[in-house]
Structures are given as C-alpha cells and as structure tokens.
Amino acid sequence: MTGMSREEVESLIQEVLEVYPEKARKDRNKHLAVNDPAVTQSKKCIISNKKSQPGLMTIRGCAYAGSKGVVWGPIKDMIHISHGPVGCGQYSRAGRRNYYIGTTGVNAFVTMNFTSDFQEKDIVFGGDKKLAKLIDEVETLFPLNKGISVQSECPIGLIGDDIESVSKVKGAELSKTIVPVRCEGFRGVSQSLGHHIANDAVRDWVLGKRDEDTTFASTPYDVAIIGDYNIGGDAWSSRILLEEMGLRCVAQWSGDGSISEIELTPKVKLNLVHCYRSMNYISRHMEEKYGIPWMEYNFFGPTKTIESLRAIAAKFDESIQKKCEEVIAKYKPEWEAVVAKYRPRLEGKRVMLYIGGLRPRHVIGAYEDLGMEVVGTGYEFAHNDDYDRTMKEMGDSTLLYDDVTGYEFEEFVKRIKPDLIGSGIKEKFIFQKMGIPFREMHSWDYSGPYHGFDGFAIFARDMDMTLNNPCWKKLQAPWEASEGAEKVAASA
C-alpha cells in the first residue's frame, strides 16, 4: 500500500495533472491509474504504447536504441555498424554492461563503436557507397567477426538509402551474414518498435540458415535463453541453475550470445523468455514456424526463481523434475541466510520503480522476499499485455504510471515519500539530490548479477547498502544545524 486510500491516490493523480493544458491533461490522465489486482484487462484503466505528448519530458528512447542498444548490440561476435552520424553510436556504446567472454577487438566487439560518421555531403549524395567501403574496412581490420549488422539512424530513412541492397551484395561477396536493420529513431513511439524491427531482422536474415544442418546433435533437454542481455552477468547466474537441473542451454541471446547460437535456436525443445517485451515476437515466430513452445520465467528473488524452475521442469520428464527439486534444496540454506541477514534491516521499506522491459513487474517479488513493498511502478515503453501481468503482482491502491514524465514522477515521489527509488540514469541524480536513496535498475548501478540465487545475495546487499548508508543522515549542512539550534535556544 502507498499509505493512502484509493480515493487519495486518485486525488493525487488529478492534483499532479492540474498544471497541464486541458488536452495534455486529458491524455496523461489515461496513462495513470490506481491499481486493482482484480482487474483482468489493464486497458480498462490505463493505456500504453502511445505517442508521447510534445513538450513533456519523456524518459523514453528511440527505435535505434531498442534495436542496437538492446537486441543486436550484445551479440558478441558480430560487428554492429551505427549507420549515420557519430553521436548515436557513441552514446549507446557500452552503457548497458552486457558482459561477454572473448577478446575485445579480436573475436568480440560488444563495447566498440563502429560508425559510418555521416557528414553533410553524405546526406546530399547518399551513403550507400560509404557503407560498402566501411564493410570492406571492417572485414580487413577485424577478420574474425562472424557477421555484421547495419543499424540505421534517422538520416538513413529520411534520404532513402538502400541498405538492403548493399547488405545483400556485400554479404554474397564476403560469404558472410550482413543484416540491414531499419531501426531509424523516428519510427514508432519508443524503443519498443526497435525491438520488434530487430526481431523481424533476426527472422528474415538469420533464422533458417542452419535448418538443414545435420551435424548438430540434439538432445531432449535442449533449451534457449532468450531476452537475457547478461547485464552484470545475469544470464550466467541463470544458466547455472538450468544446467544443474539437467537442461542443455544451446543458445543464450543476446547477452554473451553468438550468431551461431541464434542460428541453432530453431533446434531446441523449449524457448525460455526472460524479457517478454523485447523478444516475444521472435519467440512467437519460432512457435508458429518450428513448433517450439516458449514460456516466460522470472529469476528475480528466491520465491519467483523457485516458481519458475518448477514451471520449467514441468515441461520435461520426471528426471528433470527430480533434479529441479535437488537444485532448490541445495540453494535453500544460501538464500535463507540472505533473508535472515537483510530482511530485518529492510522490512517495511517502500519502493517506487520506473524502468523498462520486464523489471517493473519482475523485481517486485525480490523486494517482497526482503519484506519491502513496491508502492508504485511503471514502464517506459510497455504494451497493455505488460500491465495485464503487472496488476496481478502489485498491491491494491498502489500507483501505476505509463510513460511518466519527469515532472509527474517527482511530484508522485514528493507525496508518496518512498524509502527507495529504482529507475534509470536520467532520474538518478535528481532524486539523490532530493536526499532519496536510489538504485539504477537498468544496468544495476555497476553491480550484479541480480538473477538466480547467487544474484539475490547481491541484490539484497545492494538494497541494504543504499538504504542504510549513513550518508542519508548527514544531508543537513553543519551551519544549517547550528542555525536551527540557535533558533530553538532563542525561542526558549
């Protein structure tokens, strides 16, 4: 609970919206709601995946960010060209902490920035020849790359360059997979369309290449981890549990993933989807074309991890189900010790979240395992099926906010007064300057992993370290304290 009744939260929403002109106020009102877990269809009370109001300080990203920054960028043995001006590639380089195994610049390229560095003359005369030359240079300088993706920035779509033709010609010439991705930033309303475009590019240019490959030896226990970007090593801590219960992870993508793993994914028996929002499209495609079932899972916190492990094991035979219970029993003392240590220090603390992807709902259980309560949550780029899932996880009369503006978020925080905020880098310093403990929940504030039982110990430590840091008791300047004491003495 927010500590406020349903009527009070509804009143708060209206108070915050009062500053807007009528048109903007009506639009934003549709994106804010008081949660009711009994509601089965979120569209009855909140809308999402709509264009942000011009002039409002949205926290969203663009389609290029969704494609290059999320889906394609972490594939380690491919070179991802930011085709356009230098800024987009530079500002999206290495920011998400997608861990990988490999030698950077030799057989892994995740943290490097490859750009066609568009200039004015390229806008005037087109950049197809420049792109072809760049691909040749990349092949000469980095011969161990296994493929190339061309991530289009805004000017490419505006001037009508034919990146598909260049990719086909150079791919045939070099006998290498070269994938054109039409992810210009102006497309769609957020980075969500970039995810979809990237999924479609995987479908059209990568999947199917090894369908006739008979050298791959399948087993009944082959799975693929999809939609885990290995931030801080998340995919590794998840993979440990799956392999301990007897499953074989043929592919994980895109964090620490390779193009070969993606090509082999149609041969697995089950696709395990962590980030539903960014990877449900390709999972549905593989279900339709190859008959591969898929399921969501949640490895944040022991309660949800155990639920997910059992749900995954139920898709296989009794031997896997038995090993699953053995894995759960093995790690039980470990996570119980974490709860015993940190729950007394965190019990009753209230959290507000504003993130993207899956986290606004997936991390709720991890906080609850520590005795904390999420009193407000929202997504940057959700669709209504995300809110359908979220409303069941949130308590009654808690606050939901879609594409929340900087102003709205600050005002909600001032009134609800959470003990902790989990959001992104753009919000971090605003709330820290307000004296509110904050965790950057896009890339784990240079920490992690947070997935699985191992990750839960780090998650709990980080929340305790943030909330119970003695610095929050020292925010008042010494001269302000002395002035206050003088006033008290004078009044006495």
Swiss-Prot record:
User: Per the entry, what modulates this protein's activity?
Assistant: Nitrogenase holoenzyme is subject to 'conformational protection' by FeSII; under oxidizing conditions FeSII binds to the holoenzyme and reversibly protects it from oxidation.
Q: Which Pfam families does the protein's record reference? A: Oxidored_nitro
Q: Which GO terms describe its cellular component?
A: molybdenum-iron nitrogenase complex
What does the UniProt keyword field contain? ATP-binding, Iron, Iron-sulfur, Metal-binding, Molybdenum, Nitrogen fixation, Nucleotide-binding, Oxidoreductase
User: Which positions does UniProt annotate for [8Fe-7S] cluster binding?
Assistant: 62, 88, 154
Q: How is the cofactor bound?
A: Binds 1 [8Fe-7S] cluster per heterodimer. Binds 1 [7Fe-Mo-9S-C-homocitryl] cluster per subunit.
In the induction comment, the record states: Constitutively expressed during log and stationary phase in sucrose-limited cultures, its levels decrease during stationary phase (at protein level).
Instruction: Give the EC class as a word.
Output: oxidoreductase
Does Metal-binding appear among the keywords?
A: yes
| Entry-linked CDD domains | Nitrogenase_MoFe_alpha
Query: What's this protein's family per the entry?
Result: Belongs to the NifD/NifK/NifE/NifN family.
What name is this protein filed under?
Answer: Nitrogenase molybdenum-iron protein alpha chain
Species this chain originates from:
Azotobacter vinelandii
Q: Which gene name belongs to this protein?
A: nifD
